[in-house]
Swiss-Prot record:
Keywords from the named record: Cytoplasm, Methyltransferase, RNA-binding, rRNA processing, S-adenosyl-L-methionine, Transferase
Any one Gene Ontology molecular-function term assigned to this protein's record: 16S rRNA (adenine(1518)-N(6)/adenine(1519)-N(6))-dimethyltransferase activity
Reaction catalysed by this enzyme: adenosine(1518)/adenosine(1519) in 16S rRNA + 4 S-adenosyl-L-methionine = N(6)-dimethyladenosine(1518)/N(6)-dimethyladenosine(1519) in 16S rRNA + 4 S-adenosyl-L-homocysteine + 4 H(+)
Protein role: Specifically dimethylates two adjacent adenosines (A1518 and A1519) in the loop of a conserved hairpin near the 3'-end of 16S rRNA in the 30S particle. May play a critical role in biogenesis of 30S subunits.
Name by which UniProt lists this protein: Ribosomal RNA small subunit methyltransferase A
Entry binding sites for S-adenosyl-L-methionine: N27, L29, G54, E75, D100, N125
Recorded name of the encoding gene: rsmA
Family named by the database record: Belongs to the class I-like SAM-binding methyltransferase superfamily. rRNA adenine N(6)-methyltransferase family. RsmA subfamily.
InterPro entries membership: KsgA/Erm (IPR001737), rRNA_Ade_diMease-like_C (IPR023165), rRNA_Ade_Mease_Trfase_CS (IPR020596), rRNA_Ade_methylase_Trfase_N (IPR020598), rRNA_adenine_dimethylase (IPR011530), SAM-dependent_MTases_sf (IPR029063)
SMART domains in alphabetical order: rADc
Amino acid sequence: MRIADYSVTKAVLDRHGFTFKKSFGQNFLTDTNILQKIVDTAEIDQNVNVIEIGPGIGALTEFLAENAAEVMAFEIDDRLVPILADTLRDFDNVQVVNQDILKADLQTQIKQFKNPDLPIKVVANLPYYITTPILMHLIESKIPFQEFVVMMQREVADRISAEPNTKAYGSLSIAVQYYMTAKVAFIVPRTVFVPAPNVDSAILKMVRRDQPLIEVKDEDFFFRVSRLSFVHRRKTLWNNLTSHFGKSEDIKAKLEKGLALADIKPSIRGEALSIQDFGKLADALKEVGL
């Protein structure tokens, strides 16, 4: 029997008198086939350390621990720590860290792996309400996570992996794909969770690029330009840029010059621009003094 078997999950929750907290976005997976598929997608083996976020009662952790060198599981809910100590008692390669992943000192934590030089992969069932902040926090950290295989709301997975000229494409697509390749591996129906969420989930596989997709003069400015270009999706690039930078004659002259330098039409919408286009635009706007 597995932790994820519905009868085992129910017995564990009943034994510990556990009640779900909406504020933590808790939905526990009760399908062992999907858990095995997650591990297979992440290609976990004895030469890999894993960071898991939100282990719950240890359903995914069990599968990870059977395959990885070591698993470090970050759990924010104090009430789950003794439950994890119970369900994972047979594993000596699991560390449960009772901390918010957004506040944890990850540089220090990863040194606690028995072999900290092994590649690190992030595998997680992320709470819907905080998926994007966690992902961006990890991606932008200086820790060389090799790969992310994460479960999230299907809509967010579609946005992250979206291509230009699609409804899902936006600043989040650009922010992630600048650093990583991103592809939806498979869909997870809402019916395999306790309690069942209101929407389906997706497993997103992201692999870190050897270097960012493009080279830009100023990364912060590049991300700023991409974000502001989608503030009003139906507005033209020109309208979004002037709404942000201003509408004085001097500013408009600089914007016109920058757009011409980047060879981008002011009448285009942000969703039509590739990441490479945004790189050219940001560099050009920087060059003209914006």
